[in-house]
């Protein structure tokens, strides 16, 4: 059950009309962009709900108009930012692009955006492992795996004959013995005669057995070094010229592997780098907000890259370098897990807590399948109902802008992949959101409200006060998509009062401070009661 606990007010018959349709109007030139007291965008003094498309070319402008989007974020075309923004302006659309001094002052420039996902995790190692001449690198098997301590992983050496890698350590070590962990796979060459050189001096020549596992070799005398080079001088031939290696190890007098350098996760852009870019942008153009999009790795449920302590340190630092914070998670497109749709809502709640009450928050929402992370024959469809549910989850939890991710990679690449039914559904949804934006972005209602679904199904709601009316935006959050009856308790609501169901052509009759309604799985309803 979700609750607001705030002062009470009285309500009477709801006789007000629905907000007038304004969806089709081209957007006017921007004189001023502000952040309002409800963490909303305000353009020329009026509340504005950005409905964004990500990284589209100018050729996709008709697609954006077809779904009722109002903002293109990221320049996905070949035009320079200045020309790109002009193309958007000519079609009544706003643009958000990477900072570009040449693009400043454009009539439809809504804001600037940092490089995408600065928090995206990458693995680094304290040891630098460098390839020798002629070695072809395989990005899926990075060289640092050779000293990561994981014996079941491997690194491709292509070609294996004469392959050479150099391990550079942060500080000198002294070893008494060395180890080589081979991988043996059908059809692949296997290392046979190998050599080790430390600081340019040979310390070991060895012949390896054609078998898996560690092969250990004592040195004639201890060797001290910070740079160790391993070379394959001959191979057990295979059908392929390439082979692989699992680990190199070096043991000190105590028997510890002092070559061991487990990788760790770090953001691809350090907070200090993002902060410097933010200061540069704000110094050059203080008139426009700076946006950022994060991955979902700030969420409590995701600690596979950053543990809780790292999350708590990293993300507040990032947050200080933006005016608007967003994130992306694609439960079906990225994970094939429709049961994860709730994470869109949870992510917005957690991001809102990080952003604070005054910073706008946005969420990127999936619209289609075709990801490179799920096999094409296994990919589930992203349905219009899924996308609509995710959008409302984000808005109810506090997002004040919505973005749509429309790219696909399979079976072929497209910037804008939604078709047919999804395009029509997005147009209906975005037109509705454009109409409702003043109410959605209004101040929280000064009323005590409770919502409970039958059978204790999960639910949530948002309530605002706009132009003398109480607005309630409510949703069934049950991931099993069960239907439930919602009971709303609204302090001050008079028995017999009519509650308008916005955009549904029907109304409800209140009991004494209460009304009920049916909610299909993941469905939302919008209610209006006159104050």
Identify the residue ranges that each predicted region occupies:
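Aromatic, loop-rich ligand-recognition surfaces of beta-strand-rich domains
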Residues: 145-204, 210-265
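Carbohydrate-binding surface patches
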Residues: 453-493, 522
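C-terminal beta-strand-rich structural cap/linker in extracellular carbohydrate-active enzymes
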Residues: 510-531
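Aromatic- and acid-rich polysaccharide-binding/catalytic face
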Residues: 110, 116, 308-342, 400
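Glycan-recognition and catalytic regions of carbohydrate-active enzymes
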Residues: 410, 420-469
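Catalytic domains of carbohydrate-active enzymes, especially glycoside hydrolases
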Residues: 53-87, 91-102, 320-325
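Active-site clefts of carbohydrate-active enzymes
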Residues: 351-384
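Aromatic/acidic polysaccharide-binding cleft in carbohydrate-active enzymes
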Residues: 364, 378-431
């Amino acid at each position: 059950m979700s609750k607001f606990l705030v002062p009470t007010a009285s309500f009477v018959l709801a006789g007000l009309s629905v907000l007038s349709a304004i969806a089709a109007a081209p957007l006017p030139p921007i004189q001023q962009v502000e952040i309002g007291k409800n963490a909303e965008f305000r353009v020329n003094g009026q509340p504005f709900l950005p409905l964004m498309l990500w990284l589209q070319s100018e050729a996709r402008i008709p697609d954006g108009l077809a779904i009722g989007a109002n903002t293109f974020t990221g320049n996905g075309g070949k035009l320079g930012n200045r020309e790109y923004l002009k193309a958007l302006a000519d079609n009544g659309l706003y643009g958000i692009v990477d900072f570009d001094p040449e693009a400043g002052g454009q009539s439809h420039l809504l804001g600037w955006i940092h490089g995408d996902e600065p928090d995206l995790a990458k693995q680094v190692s304290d040891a630098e492992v460098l390839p020798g001449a002629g070695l072809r690198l395989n990005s899926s098997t990075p060289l640092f795996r050779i000293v990561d301590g994981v014996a079941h992983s491997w690194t491709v050496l292509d070609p294996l004959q004469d392959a050479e890698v150099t391990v550079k350590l942060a500080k000198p070590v002294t070893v008494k013995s060395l180890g080589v962990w081979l991988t043996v796979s059908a059809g692949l060459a296997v290392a046979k005669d190998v050599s080790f050189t430390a600081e340019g001096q040979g310390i070991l020549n060895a012949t390896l057995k054609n078998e898996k596992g560690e092969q250990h070799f004592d040195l004639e005398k201890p060797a001290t070094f910070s740079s160790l080079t391993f070379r394959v001088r001959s191979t057990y031939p295979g059908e392929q010229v390439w082979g692989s290696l699992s680990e190199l190890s070096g043991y000190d007098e105590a028997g510890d592997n002092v070559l061991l350098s487990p990788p760790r996760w770090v953001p691809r852009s350090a907070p200090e780098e993002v902060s410097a870019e933010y200061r540069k942008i704000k110094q050059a153009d203080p008139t426009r907000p700076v946006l950022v999009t994060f991955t979902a790795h700030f969420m409590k449920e995701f600690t596979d890259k950053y543990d809780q302590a790292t999350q708590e340190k990293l993300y507040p630092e990032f947050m200080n370098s933006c005016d608007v914070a967003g994130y992306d998670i694609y439960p079906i497109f990225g994970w094939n897990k429709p049961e994860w749709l709730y994470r869109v809502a949870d992510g917005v709640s957690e991001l809102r807590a990080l952003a604070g009450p005054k910073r706008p928050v946005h969420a990127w929402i999936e619209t289609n399948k075709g990801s490179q992370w799920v096999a094409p024959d296994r990919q589930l469809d992203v349905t219009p109902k899924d996308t609509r549910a995710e959008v409302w989850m984000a808005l109810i939890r506090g997002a004040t802008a919505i973005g749509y991710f429309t790219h696909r990679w399979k079976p072929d690449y497209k910037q804008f992949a939604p078709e047919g039914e999804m395009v029509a559904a997005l147009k209906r949804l975005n037109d509705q959101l454009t109409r409702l934006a003043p109410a959605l972005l209004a101040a929280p209602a000064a009323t005590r409200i409770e919502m409970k679904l039958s059978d204790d199904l999960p639910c949530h709601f948002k309530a605002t006060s706009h132009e003398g009316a109480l607005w309630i935006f409510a949703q069934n959050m049950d991931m099993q998509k069960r239907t439930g009856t919602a009971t709303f308790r609204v302090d001050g609501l008079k028995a017999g009062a009519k509650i308008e169901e916005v955009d549904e052509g029907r109304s409800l009759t209140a009991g004494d401070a209460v009304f009920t309604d049916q909610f299909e799985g993941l469905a939302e309803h919008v209610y209006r009661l006159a104050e």
